[in-house]
Amino acid sequence: VWNPGSGYAMCAMSGAKLVLMENRFVPARFKDGYGPVGAWFLLFKARATNAFDEDYVAKHKEELKKFAPYSEASVVGTCLRNHAMLIEMKEGRGPILMHTEWALQEAEKKMDKKEFKHLIAEAWEDFLDMCVGQAGLWACLNIEPEKKPSEIMPTEPYFLGSHAGCAGAWCCGPDEEWVPEEYKKPWREIGLYNRMTTVKGLFCAGDTVGASGHKFSSGSHVEGRIAAKAMVKFCLDHKDYKPAIKETAEELKKEIYGPWYRFEQYKNATTVYEVNPNYLIPRHIQARLMKLMDEYVAGTSTYYMTNKIMLERGLELLRMLKEDMELAAARDLHELMRAWENRHRVWTAEAHLLHILFREETRYPGYYYRADYPNIDDANWRCFTLSRWNPETKQWELETYPYVQIIPDPLGP
């Protein structure tokens, strides 16, 4: 289930602004095993086709033109490649196949036996390093990648602020002359500290930082160092600051261990502990969340399609779940962790839903579609979307914020 979005949720609960929370990542992956395809495309030069060996991206070149200028890059973006793939799947020309056998057979012509044997080992090791299940799937399905292709398809949507996504906290950048005033203004009153959120003294790095994608692991490590140095500077500049919390240690203990206390109090009310009128176990909460997000918030079951009415219904169900979530119960420390993870997932999901509802366009075709606003609308929506949960009013507030180009964009307007 990847990470539960704790960074996003805790920032939101603190009243920090979030940015671009409508952005999600839906990569193509090896079907059922979730193995990565990037190495095959880039290192092994493999090609993907529909069931009839047609290059689906080239085939839908005219269709992709309606997303210009973004479709005019030398390498078509991931979401638009997904868009072409989804057309093939919906029109019955699946499955989509990654032709590992073509790539390896071509490589074999250029290599001696020793080099080729090493390449095959690399192909397997790529999955054994990152996704053991994919190697297991190949084995159990009798697939030898040098002889047979493998199915690929788009994944379920997920969040990340560091890889190919940009959802996360709205953070301050460096206090340098080249940074536009628009990107400094929100922090003028509380201080210009690199990677500080709009809550004074709350810093982020890596996945949690929004509008800062394509950092990957190494970039996230660097960003962690940037944030750490800025935190030290903040501490030195605020030596007299003495943070205090309202609650006592005992009150916090009761809150944190609340799900365990609830289970102990009510576990004997029924014969089977999973079915109990007094609580929900973490698995139940997660199943409800996944079902409603998939069906109403542009999940796989609707081919990533949604609209205003679906989103509003999803929000209604999500807020019912948020209310029921207060009755989470945990049998042990593992389920206690799961109970809190689910709380964070629900908060993150709510922010995501509200952002998709707020942005009245389809900014990322292939990742999600607004059926009622099916096009990219740069005239009105080439901007940041910001949200903030107000701890005083207990309400979400959403706004747009100007996007200022710093580095010249060859695809920009």
Q: Where are the model-predicted features located?
A:
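Long, amphipathic alpha-helical stalk/connector segments used for oligomerization, subunit docking
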Residues: 236-331
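A generic secondary-structure signal for well-formed alpha-helical elements
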Residues: 14-15, 52-53, 228-239, 360
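Acidic/polar loop patches that form or flank catalytic/metal-binding clefts of enzymes
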Residues: 16-23, 234-246, 367-368
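Catalytic phosphate/nucleotide-handling subdomain of diverse soluble enzymes
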Residues: 191-193, 197-260
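Mobile, glycine/GP-rich and aromatic-enriched active-site lid/loop segments adjacent to catalytic centers
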Residues: 22-213, 295-413
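Glycine-rich loop(s) and the adjacent beta-strand/alpha-helix scaffold that form part
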Residues: 1-36, 217-230
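Short, surface-exposed, polar/charged, turn-prone segments marking secondary-structure boundaries
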Residues: 3-13, 46-49, 76-77, 230-233, ...
